[in-house]
From Swiss-Prot:
<protein>
    <recommendedName>
        <fullName>tRNA-specific adenosine deaminase</fullName>
        <ecNumber>3.5.4.33</ecNumber>
    </recommendedName>
</protein>
<comment type="function">
    <text>Catalyzes the deamination of adenosine to inosine at the wobble position 34 of tRNA(Arg2).</text>
</comment>
<comment type="subunit">
    <text>Homodimer.</text>
</comment>
<keyword id="KW-0378">Hydrolase</keyword>
<keyword id="KW-0819">tRNA processing</keyword>
<dbReference type="GO" id="GO:0002100">
    <property type="term" value="P:tRNA wobble adenosine to inosine editing"/>
</dbReference>
<comment type="similarity">
    <text>Belongs to the cytidine and deoxycytidylate deaminase family.</text>
</comment>
<dbReference type="GO" id="GO:0052717">
    <property type="term" value="F:tRNA-specific adenosine-34 deaminase activity"/>
</dbReference>
<keyword id="KW-0862">Zinc</keyword>
<dbReference type="InterPro" id="IPR016193">
    <property type="entry name" value="Cytidine_deaminase-like"/>
</dbReference>
<dbReference type="InterPro" id="IPR016192">
    <property type="entry name" value="APOBEC/CMP_deaminase_Zn-bd"/>
</dbReference>
<feature type="active site" description="Proton donor">
    <location>
        <position position="50"/>
    </location>
</feature>
<feature type="binding site">
    <location>
        <position position="81"/>
    </location>
    <ligand>
        <name>Zn(2+)</name>
    </ligand>
</feature>
<dbReference type="InterPro" id="IPR028883">
    <property type="entry name" value="tRNA_aden_deaminase"/>
</dbReference>
<feature type="domain" description="CMP/dCMP-type deaminase">
    <location>
        <begin position="1"/>
        <end position="116"/>
    </location>
</feature>
<feature type="binding site">
    <location>
        <position position="78"/>
    </location>
    <ligand>
        <name>Zn(2+)</name>
    </ligand>
</feature>
<dbReference type="GO" id="GO:0008270">
    <property type="term" value="F:zinc ion binding"/>
</dbReference>
Length: 148
Protein backbone atom coordinates (compact mmCIF):
# COMPACT_ATOMS: atom_id res chain seq x y z
CA UNK A 1 0.00 0.00 0.00
CA UNK A 2 2.94 2.32 0.59
CA UNK A 3 3.79 2.13 -3.11
CA UNK A 4 0.17 2.94 -3.99
CA UNK A 5 0.40 5.96 -1.68
CA UNK A 6 3.52 7.10 -3.57
CA UNK A 7 1.47 6.96 -6.76
CA UNK A 8 -1.31 8.95 -5.09
CA UNK A 9 1.23 11.63 -4.17
CA UNK A 10 2.33 11.79 -7.82
CA UNK A 11 -1.30 12.36 -8.80
CA UNK A 12 -1.59 15.05 -6.11
CA UNK A 13 1.47 16.83 -7.52
CA UNK A 14 -0.15 16.80 -10.98
CA UNK A 15 -3.43 18.25 -9.66
CA UNK A 16 -5.19 14.93 -10.16
CA UNK A 17 -7.45 13.45 -7.49
CA UNK A 18 -4.82 11.58 -5.45
CA UNK A 19 -5.63 7.94 -6.02
CA UNK A 20 -2.81 5.45 -6.48
CA UNK A 21 -2.76 1.76 -7.37
CA UNK A 22 -0.35 -1.12 -7.56
CA UNK A 23 -1.00 -4.61 -8.88
CA UNK A 24 1.07 -7.33 -7.23
CA UNK A 25 1.81 -10.88 -8.39
CA UNK A 26 0.64 -13.32 -5.74
CA UNK A 27 3.35 -15.84 -6.65
CA UNK A 28 6.38 -13.65 -5.96
CA UNK A 29 4.88 -10.52 -4.32
CA UNK A 30 6.41 -8.27 -6.99
CA UNK A 31 4.65 -5.15 -8.24
CA UNK A 32 3.96 -5.54 -11.95
CA UNK A 33 2.07 -2.26 -12.46
CA UNK A 34 1.70 1.02 -10.63
CA UNK A 35 -0.50 3.92 -11.67
CA UNK A 36 -2.42 6.94 -10.50
CA UNK A 37 -5.39 8.97 -11.68
CA UNK A 38 -4.70 10.69 -14.97
CA UNK A 39 -8.09 12.16 -15.84
CA UNK A 40 -7.08 15.83 -16.09
CA UNK A 41 -3.92 15.28 -18.10
CA UNK A 42 -5.54 12.87 -20.57
CA UNK A 43 -8.85 14.77 -20.61
CA UNK A 44 -10.53 11.39 -20.27
CA UNK A 45 -12.98 10.47 -17.46
CA UNK A 46 -12.03 6.79 -17.83
CA UNK A 47 -8.43 7.34 -16.74
CA UNK A 48 -8.96 6.24 -13.15
CA UNK A 49 -5.90 4.68 -11.53
CA UNK A 50 -7.53 1.23 -11.35
CA UNK A 51 -8.58 1.22 -15.03
CA UNK A 52 -5.11 2.27 -16.16
CA UNK A 53 -3.46 -0.39 -13.96
CA UNK A 54 -5.79 -3.20 -15.03
CA UNK A 55 -5.40 -2.33 -18.70
CA UNK A 56 -1.62 -2.20 -18.39
CA UNK A 57 -1.47 -5.48 -16.44
CA UNK A 58 -3.66 -7.32 -18.96
CA UNK A 59 -1.46 -6.08 -21.80
CA UNK A 60 1.69 -7.00 -19.88
CA UNK A 61 0.68 -10.61 -19.22
CA UNK A 62 -1.42 -10.98 -22.41
CA UNK A 63 -4.50 -12.11 -20.52
CA UNK A 64 -7.86 -10.69 -19.48
CA UNK A 65 -7.74 -12.73 -16.26
CA UNK A 66 -5.64 -11.41 -13.40
CA UNK A 67 -6.55 -14.16 -10.94
CA UNK A 68 -2.91 -14.55 -9.81
CA UNK A 69 -2.73 -10.87 -8.87
CA UNK A 70 -3.89 -8.54 -6.10
CA UNK A 71 -4.76 -4.86 -6.39
CA UNK A 72 -3.94 -2.23 -3.78
CA UNK A 73 -5.84 1.06 -4.07
CA UNK A 74 -5.57 4.09 -1.82
CA UNK A 75 -9.30 4.89 -2.05
CA UNK A 76 -12.40 2.70 -2.16
CA UNK A 77 -13.10 2.02 -5.85
CA UNK A 78 -16.04 3.62 -7.65
CA UNK A 79 -18.63 1.53 -9.53
CA UNK A 80 -16.70 1.61 -12.81
CA UNK A 81 -13.48 0.48 -11.15
CA UNK A 82 -15.21 -2.15 -8.99
CA UNK A 83 -16.72 -3.62 -12.15
CA UNK A 84 -13.31 -3.65 -13.86
CA UNK A 85 -11.79 -5.38 -10.82
CA UNK A 86 -14.55 -7.98 -11.00
CA UNK A 87 -14.27 -8.57 -14.74
CA UNK A 88 -10.49 -8.92 -14.60
CA UNK A 89 -10.83 -11.46 -11.76
CA UNK A 90 -8.24 -9.90 -9.49
CA UNK A 91 -7.93 -12.27 -6.54
CA UNK A 92 -7.83 -9.73 -3.71
CA UNK A 93 -8.69 -6.05 -3.34
CA UNK A 94 -6.94 -4.05 -0.64
CA UNK A 95 -7.97 -0.44 -0.24
CA UNK A 96 -7.23 2.43 2.09
CA UNK A 97 -9.79 5.13 2.78
CA UNK A 98 -13.52 4.65 2.37
CA UNK A 99 -15.31 6.96 -0.06
CA UNK A 100 -18.72 7.83 1.36
CA UNK A 101 -19.68 9.73 -1.79
CA UNK A 102 -18.57 7.52 -4.69
CA UNK A 103 -17.34 4.28 -3.12
CA UNK A 104 -18.92 1.15 -4.56
CA UNK A 105 -17.42 -1.57 -2.37
CA UNK A 106 -18.75 -1.01 1.14
CA UNK A 107 -19.90 2.61 1.29
CA UNK A 108 -22.71 3.03 -1.23
CA UNK A 109 -23.52 0.79 -4.15
CA UNK A 110 -21.84 -2.35 -2.76
CA UNK A 111 -21.20 -3.62 -6.27
CA UNK A 112 -19.63 -6.91 -5.17
CA UNK A 113 -22.83 -7.84 -3.30
CA UNK A 114 -25.08 -7.11 -6.29
CA UNK A 115 -26.62 -9.63 -8.66
CA UNK A 116 -24.82 -7.98 -11.56
CA UNK A 117 -21.40 -8.70 -10.07
CA UNK A 118 -19.41 -11.03 -12.30
CA UNK A 119 -16.80 -12.16 -9.75
CA UNK A 120 -16.16 -11.15 -6.14
CA UNK A 121 -12.55 -10.74 -4.98
CA UNK A 122 -11.50 -11.08 -1.37
CA UNK A 123 -11.80 -7.56 0.08
CA UNK A 124 -9.64 -5.94 2.76
CA UNK A 125 -10.32 -2.32 3.69
CA UNK A 126 -8.81 0.35 5.90
CA UNK A 127 -5.19 -0.32 4.92
CA UNK A 128 -3.20 2.84 5.84
CA UNK A 129 -6.51 4.66 5.51
CA UNK A 130 -5.44 7.68 7.56
CA UNK A 131 -2.68 8.45 5.03
CA UNK A 132 -5.07 8.19 2.08
CA UNK A 133 -7.73 10.23 3.85
CA UNK A 134 -5.24 12.98 4.77
CA UNK A 135 -4.01 13.23 1.17
CA UNK A 136 -7.59 13.49 -0.13
CA UNK A 137 -8.48 16.17 2.44
CA UNK A 138 -5.37 18.16 1.61
CA UNK A 139 -6.13 17.95 -2.12
CA UNK A 140 -9.71 19.14 -1.82
CA UNK A 141 -8.74 21.92 0.61
CA UNK A 142 -6.26 23.12 -2.00
CA UNK A 143 -8.96 23.01 -4.70
CA UNK A 144 -11.46 24.91 -2.52
CA UNK A 145 -8.93 27.58 -1.57
CA UNK A 146 -8.07 28.11 -5.25
CA UNK A 147 -11.76 28.74 -5.97
CA UNK A 148 -12.17 31.26 -3.13
Amino acid sequence: MEQALKQARLAFDKNEVPVGVVIVCRLNQKIIVSSHNNIEEKKNPLCHAEIIAINTACNLISSKNLNDYDIYVTLEPCAMCASAISHSRLKRLFYGASDSKHGAVESNLRYFNSNSCFYRPEIYSGILSEHSRFLMQEFFQRIRSAID
